[in-house]
Amino acid sequence: MDCQACELADGRRDLPGGLIHRTDLWLVEHCVGPLGLGTLIVKPERHVTAVADLTANEAAELGPLLRQASAVAAGLVPADQVYNCLWAHAGGVPVHLHYVVQPVTSQQMADYGAHGPALQMAMFDRGTAPEPAEVERVADVARARFATF
């Protein structure tokens, strides 16, 4: 089975910014899609498609890690809010569970004329991903911030 999340984690696919943070069971990386600079992905290292299928240890690490990732993301761009969204579908098929931790600015909401899920859909529709060099720069800052926890 092809899994983009697994391929990014094991190096079969290019990951701009590289791995940002790792716990015993979870990985944090910059989003490879069009959800904006500073958007982080929090995903279990193992392939799992549903929260109900997380182990007790994976579940125990998740809350504190989402809190940390949100704090890091909030400082990467001038965010007015940080969205935390569970994504686990591609083409209507369950895929590798991952949380999108997205710092959102008032400028983005104005540019796209949307907020919340409508903003994310508008960003996907436009399809403009951040420049790899900017992702590398932001990933370095994120790594340094995770190191303070």
Please place each PLM-identified region on the residue numbering.
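HIT superfamily nucleotide-processing domains
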Residues: M1-F149
